Amino acid sequence: MSWQQRVDDALTARRVTDTLRRRYVVSQGAGRWLVANGRQYLNFSSNDYLGLSQHPQIIRAWQQAATRFGVGSGGSGHISGYSVAHQALEEELAQWLGYPRALLFISGFAANQAVITALMKKNDRIVADRLSHASLLEAANLSPAQLRRFIHNDTQHLSRLLQSPCVGQQLVVTEGVYSMDGDSAPLAEIQHIARRHHAWLLVDDAHGIGVTGDEGRGTCWLRGVKPELLVVTFGKGFGVSGAAVLCSESVADYLLQFARHLVYSTSMPPAQAQALSASLAVIRSDEGGERREKLAALVQRFRAGVNASRFTLLNAHSAIQPLIVGDNSRALRLAEALRQQGCWATAIRPPTVPVGTARLRLTLTQAHEACDIDRLLEVLHGAGE
């Protein structure tokens, strides 16, 4: 088989199963409205849960820092790219979340890959929830450690896997809020089981940080859990981009030596770090609390209005509200039907989700109004098959 045939066969396989991914060019993709091809849609696909990507205070912080620092960091943080803005943000994050240290990464994918590949050795074992993010599972597969997956949120299965003999160390991997199902992990029980077996716990709280808990401290704080490794990302609740790993002093020093994604990458622009500090200030303020309360009310309104006879609604109380439709083609048709009625929603299909669970992944944000939710429900019930 030639290179070209390999590429063509892979693309053909995606096309015939209605799983070929496509990008859409948009003029505006965050906030209440999405603008594409000159048309405005109610946006139910954005991760900008608190609407902070459009916040004037955060925009101004980025602009002012770009004037001071320029638009790039100029290098790896180990060379010349670790500015006072980066240092300030790390210290603010650590204080906010109650950890000795925080380390910044350019993305959540990079943070998860870096931590797992740096820590795990040949005789170690990773025990991960089956629905963990692709960045976590890919890192686990690429590491020299053994990967075992437990049934989603099944703590008994997790316990059985941890009980089997392991020569090295064990790392339990889960998420705070799951990106495709929108549900939460039983973190307190998972932490108890991990500690009973002397395993460390890594929690990726990409979809919980900023959005839940006191001052937006996230799912772990809400559940009274403090994992050895907490990964938070800034493209959702913070409305910007990037990520951080919260950990102990010694683990931070270790990652600075052995996390290749950190050592060999240009750090985020200082202006981005300063914008993130401004975003954190909003999240922790009374305004941030009001934004979280509004989002929670919108989620409740949506769930109360969905016709369960037409759609399978998962037990999700986060901003992520997936409607399971099963068939790939039906999911695509529903997404297109919603767009025709002015609502932008995304059809999620395998391999992102298991076969037979294609869905509309609807995301609600603080930028929406109650009338937007009512319009979405009206269109959904009219488009049901």
From Swiss-Prot:
Pathway where it operates: Cofactor biosynthesis; biotin biosynthesis
Key word Aminoacyl-tRNA synthetase present: no
Keywords: Biotin biosynthesis, Pyridoxal phosphate, Transferase
Residues bound to pyridoxal 5'-phosphate: G108, F109, S179, H207, T233
Homology family: Belongs to the class-II pyridoxal-phosphate-dependent aminotransferase family. BioF subfamily.
Highest classification ranks of the organism: Bacteria, Pseudomonadati, Pseudomonadota, Gammaproteobacteria, Enterobacterales
Gene Ontology molecular functions: 8-amino-7-oxononanoate synthase activity; pyridoxal phosphate binding
Purpose of the protein: Catalyzes the decarboxylative condensation of pimeloyl-[acyl-carrier protein] and L-alanine to produce 8-amino-7-oxononanoate (AON), [acyl-carrier protein], and carbon dioxide.
Assembly and interaction partners: Homodimer.
Highest rank taxon of the organism: Bacteria
Protein name: 8-amino-7-oxononanoate synthase
GO terms of biological process kind: biotin biosynthetic process
Pfam family, one: Aminotran_1_2
Catalytic activity, reaction form: 6-carboxyhexanoyl-[ACP] + L-alanine + H(+) = (8S)-8-amino-7-oxononanoate + holo-[ACP] + CO2
Residues modified as N6-(pyridoxal phosphate)lysine: K236
Gene3D superfamilies (alphabetical): Aspartate Aminotransferase, domain 1, Type I PLP-dependent aspartate aminotransferase-like (Major domain)
SUPFAM superfamilies: PLP-dependent transferases
Binding positions (substrate): R21, H133, T352
Named cofactor requirement(s): pyridoxal 5'-phosphate
EC number of the protein: 2.3.1.47
